[in-house]
């Protein structure tokens, strides 16, 4: 199964996920990770770890990150593999294109 994670500083990930869900009628399960939103929130490392722990080891994961090399990107970098891909510089057209791509497409 292909999993989708949108990750960003502040609330960009929430807004992008909400818009993709609206335009696609929520046909895919998309997770959003919004870092550094409030004091006292769960550390992003913990959020990312728990999210990956909830996936099957055979799942393919596409992570959409806001900035290459940024602190959010760095939390996902250790998970990159043949099955975990991080796409940086996210925007709505790119995210829609990849989410709507067939899961059979490599």
Where are the predicted features?
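N-terminal loops that bind phosphate or other acidic moieties
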Residues: 1-106
């Amino acid at each position: 199964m292909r999993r989708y994670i949108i990750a960003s500083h502040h609330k960009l990930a929430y807004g992008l996920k909400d818009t993709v869900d609206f335009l696609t009628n929520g046909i895919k399960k998309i997770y959003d990770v919004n870092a550094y939103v409030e004091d006292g929130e769960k550390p992003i490392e913990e959020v990312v770890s728990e999210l990956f722990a909830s996936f099957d080891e055979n799942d393919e994961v596409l992570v959409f990150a806001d900035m290459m090399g940024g602190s959010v990107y760095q939390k996902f970098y250790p998970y990159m593999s043949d099955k975990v891909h991080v796409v940086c510089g996210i925007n709505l057209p790119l995210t829609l294109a990849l989410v709507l791509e067939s899961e059979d497409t490599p």
